[in-house]
Curated annotation (Swiss-Prot):
UniProt keyword list: Disulfide bond, Secreted, SH3 domain, Signal
SUPFAM superfamilies: SH3-domain
Similarity comment text for this entry: Belongs to the MIA/OTOR family.
Tissue specificity statement from the Swiss-Prot or TrEMBL entry: Highly expressed in cochlea.
Compartment(s) where it occurs, according to its Swiss-Prot or TrEMBL record: Secreted
Gene: OTOR
Pfam family, one: SH3_2
Residue span, SH3 domain: 42-114
Disulphide bonds in the chain: C35-C40, C58-C131
N-terminal signal peptide: 1-23
Protein name: Otoraplin
Main location: secreted
An example Gene Ontology biological process: cartilage condensation
């Protein structure tokens, strides 16, 4: 009995400390995305936010008017869904959020500089919409 309790306690401790055990898979926003490369790691463009945006859930990022955002992928719009791009904020004043990649509405930003064309169409996967 003691060994069973000890095993359960260890399992709970390691399970709670493991960051992979705390995530959740959210609904897909699209089935395809456009990227600059096959792995979607290269920056497509730099955009500036034209309006503030409060993220409705963990798939999205908060953006402030005037903020610069690096774009890594562009979801292919489907039927009545919105058009969303994935990126991360840029700038020293936003260093707490730098590196966090999330979606934001394309309609709220203007492209400042295009680094590479997004000409690779890639299927989205569940991990594209995973939240920690």
């Amino acid at each position: 009995m003691t060994q069973r309790v000890y095993s359960i306690v260890l399992f709970l401790c390691f399970g709670l400390m493991n960051p992979f055990a705390t995530g959740i898979f959210m609904d897909k926003l699209a089935s395809k995305k456009l990227c600059a490369d096959d792995d979607c790691v290269y920056t497509i463009s730099l955009v500036r936010a034209e309006e503030d945006y409060n993220a409705p859930d963990c798939r999205f990022i908060n953006i402030k008017k005037g903020q610069l955002i690096y774009v890594y992928s562009k979801l292919v719009k489907e039927k009545e869904s919105g058009e969303f791009w994935a990126g991360s904020v840029y700038g020293e004043e936003y260093e707490d959020h730098m590196g966090t990649v999330g979606y934001f509405p394309r309609s709220l930003v203007s492209e400042q500089h295009v680094y590479q064309e997004a000409n690779k169409t890639i299927p989205t996967t569940d991990i594209d919409f995973f939240c920690e």
